[in-house]
Amino acid sequence: MEEERIYTIPLRDVTNKSPTTKRAPRAMRAIRDFLKKHMKSDIVKLDNSINEKVWERSLNKIPAKVRVKVVKEGDVVKATLIE
């Protein structure tokens, strides 16, 4: 059974609570943790487009939020960026 959802993931907490040199890696981790929590699965695969969006303006200027489309197939969760 396939389940599909659209989420807006806030990254403002990552910006406020992280040093500038660690924001992008922590944002990627925050996205993965958000999807694990909301989709109730441990296996989360992020599309390269999400990575490019977070790293687009370098290490320390991450976006405030990211909109993703999430598809759950069995136990695997796959996320892609919505433009």
UniProtKB/Swiss-Prot annotation:
Pfam families: Ribosomal_L31e (PF01198). InterPro entries: Ribosomal_eL31, Ribosomal_eL31_CS, Ribosomal_eL31_dom_sf. SUPFAM superfamilies: Ribosomal protein L31e (SSF54575). SMART domains: Ribosomal_L31e. Disulfide bonds: none annotated. Keywords: Ribonucleoprotein, Ribosomal protein. Coiled coil: none annotated. One of its GO terms (molecular function) is structural constituent of ribosome. GO terms for biological process: cytoplasmic translation. PROSITE patterns: RIBOSOMAL_L31E. GO terms for cellular component: cytosolic large ribosomal subunit. Belongs to the eukaryotic ribosomal protein eL31 family. This is Large ribosomal subunit protein eL31. It comes from Methanococcus maripaludis (strain C5 / ATCC BAA-1333). The gene is rpl31e.
